[in-house]
Amino acid sequence: MNKYYWIACGIAASSLLAAGTQAQNPVTQKPVKQKAPYLNRSLPLDARVQDLISRMTLAEKVDQMVNNTDAIPRLQIPAYDWWSEALHGVARSGVATIFPEPIGMAATFDDSLVNRVGTAISDEARAMYNAAIREDSHERFGGLTFWTPNINIFRDPRWGRGQETYGEDPFLTAHMGVALVKGLQGDDPHYLKVAACAKHYAVHSGPEKLRHVFNAEVSPKDLWETYLPAFHALVSDAKVEAVMCAYNRTNDEACCANTYLLQDVLRNQWGFKGHIVTDCDALEDIYKGHQLAPDKVHAAALALQRGVNLNCGDTYFALIDAVKQGLVTEKQIDSSLAVLLRTRFKLGMFDPSADNPYNQIPVSVINSPEHRELARTVAQKSLVLLKNDGALPLRNDLKKYFVTGPNASSVDVLLGNYYGVNGQLVTILEGLASHIKPGSQMGYKQGILLDRGNISPIDWTTGEAKSSDATIVVMGISGLLEGEEGESIASPTAGDRLDYNIPQNQVDFLRKIKEGNPHPVIAVITGGSPMNLAEVQKLADAVLLVWYPGEEGGNAVADVLFGKVSPSGKLPVTFPQSLDQLPAFTDYAMKGRTYRYMDAEPLYPFGFGLSYTTFAYSRLKVSGGALHADASSASGTVPHARGAQASGTVLRVGQSLAVEATVTNTGRYKSDEVVQLYLTHKGSSLVVPLFSLKGFHRISLAPGQSKVVHFTLTPQQLSLVNEEGLNVQPSDTITISVGDAVPTPRSLALGASLPVQTTISVQ
């Protein structure tokens, strides 16, 4: 039961006794007579909404359909701004807990942890809102409608906003997105804690500079296999309250006026009942950028007819003229507004304050010790160890440590984008300094600038590094170089990274430190996207990818480097060796992209990440209907890596499949492990992925401990998507692989565990 329920019940009882026929409006704190049906909570929701709409003028209705709505004093409706952000913590609204950027959350492969993050964020959001309403404050970014999560597919490492996503895989993205939305929206049967929003619907991932004019051309197969599954999951499984349409066109129709995406798929096929909101000024793009309408009036009419309920921007004010010109009717506006107002009713904005348990959440939850500890845990589990030649974990009692690099003392590399603020930010330098023992020394110099050569030719850094027992170089990129159009002030390409390399001055600096240095050099890499780390991989004794790790990032990095916690993050994106391995940035076809369709050998493969311990996989068993196979012995190569194999078993079309495997910690350290299940289809006439992630579990194992991990594969998960975009389950052969990375030779060469595998036939 909701933890605030019993508090609310007591307050509600006393409030009702005191109020009699009047209720205290939670937003205005002014008496409102209960005789108005829209204020009568006992009436059906739709009846209340219709009653409220019936009391509005056309101008008032239209005003309620833009993000920054005016108050309607005669109805005691306050001003409200629909635009709030909470990508990895409440953003742009003051003090809040700052969790790792979503790409880092994805690296945890832990959807239950992400659900806890969503719960913490929405608790803080409600507490902030409650405090603001008491002060009669209705500022932007202070509401309860949050335009998050970003569940676009990170199909190309050049996209600057890929850091906001859960990576390149639709299965992982769906699970992480569903978990966050459920945490955000809460579990009360009557009220939403906050309203989440799935964005950017539906085929949107750069280039940033072209997003207001670009047409993403995508086949039915790629649309339904890659770009739509996460949105479908959030609508059907998480009951997400809102969907945001994107700036660009998809297959020649503007996403915010797209008959197929908004009506045929979202409303009719999926049965979406929530509201559709535009990205900010996307309706302006319809007549300016895409030139699909002659003017603002026609663009507003087109969007309304296609199902858009809320306009972030001012284009919808033209709906008044659209009615006058006969382009739309007031009845159409009423129908669209009704969908939108349902959200405000579900948030409790027209009910007595005491009726809603979420109104009792106190401000003490904001950046509380519990939330900071959660931020630290998420950051710990997000860090990905890419290389370790025995340099890690470090002892914390060496005589002298040296920390250097452009990002060691940077706050920006903790934050990513869409962030809040607080006084608890722990830089990587601060985290490292707090972990060494008294008597040890730690020196620090930034050494170099982020992305250009030093102005002064004098070098006082590399010599000090070489005289230290261990050097930690904190390098990579930051939000200055990648992000949303307009946010990345050092980016020459609107936040995208058209140069895949890390800044050359950083590579030269690392090389100079390593040359002739007998002591370990550890590279700590910050950033939100894949980058060319080939030289770093060669030069450094250990490489730790830390993403944008949030306010506790410094402590989490130190926890891992000094061995308090074993690294356990896994890559949610493929790191190509170079951009030459990829199609053009503007090509939205999946051929040659991501681990599922890229046949070139990457620098780092999807799902990869090392640990301080080692794991052994064994005893793979599959069963379904009459099928039972035990593939417990290691033999053969199926299809790209050695492992356990069994052949000749048969699964009937339409049956589910149970899979289990045993995982053993064969090393010296306690550690988490992310157990991953991949499918490879053979023998089908369809174009199929090389591999498809269909299951993952995060487990914790002490040295010598074993656990049996269970998966269930549904007929849907065993099916394929054909060229028409339809799910089919053909007769073919499926290889099932269970391990800790995508099962390729490159994964094994980098140190991944040997997977166990079996092959079944589907008939």
Locate each region found by the language model.
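Short beta-strand elements
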Residues: 746-763
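A carboxyl-terminal module marker
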Residues: 674, 718-724, 749-751
